[in-house]
């Protein structure tokens, strides 16, 4: 229940029955299945119907268009679609406060990206944790 498997849409392009069966088996065994890069390439609504996903990951290419009327509508549509299918959402690549506020206000479940922090080494992460713990 604590293990998540991220699958990109391109995996479904070949529609290999053996692969699809393996994904279904993982889900039935309790693994959470996340569909990464949703809407960027090979997705189809039939795939959402036929496969058991737990989470849709909103690709950075859509997050980058937040602030544009049409971009906002697309992101909102993905969030609403996920909600209607009882899936959670993760927005990737959030870099600005505007993007964060929009996603938060429109019900995105998890928001990640450089807005919160840049990638760092394990040593830098330990130092960050130590400094935050010492300040308490």
Predicted regions and their residues:
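Aromatic/hydrophobic pocket-lining residues that form π-stacking "cages" and hydrophobic walls in ligand
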Residues: 78
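The catalytic core of metal-dependent phosphodiesterases that act on cyclic dinucleotides
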Residues: 1-66, 81, 85-119
């Amino acid at each position: 229940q604590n293990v998540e498997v991220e699958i990109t849409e391109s995996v479904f392009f070949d529609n290999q029955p053996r692969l699809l069966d393996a994904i279904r088996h993982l889900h039935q065994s309790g693994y959470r299945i996340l569909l990464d890069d949703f809407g960027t390439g090979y997705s189809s609504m039939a795939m959402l119907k036929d496969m058991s996903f737990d989470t849709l990951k909103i690709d950075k290419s859509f997050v980058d268009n937040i602030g544009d009327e049409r971009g906002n509508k697309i992101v909102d549509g993905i969030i609403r679609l996920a909600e209607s299918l009882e899936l959670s959402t993760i927005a990737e690549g959030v870099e600005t406060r505007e993007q964060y506020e929009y996603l938060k206000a429109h019900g995105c479940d998890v928001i990640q990206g450089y807005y919160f922090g840049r990638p760092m080494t394990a040593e830098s992460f330990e130092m960050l944790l130590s400094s935050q713990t010492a300040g308490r």
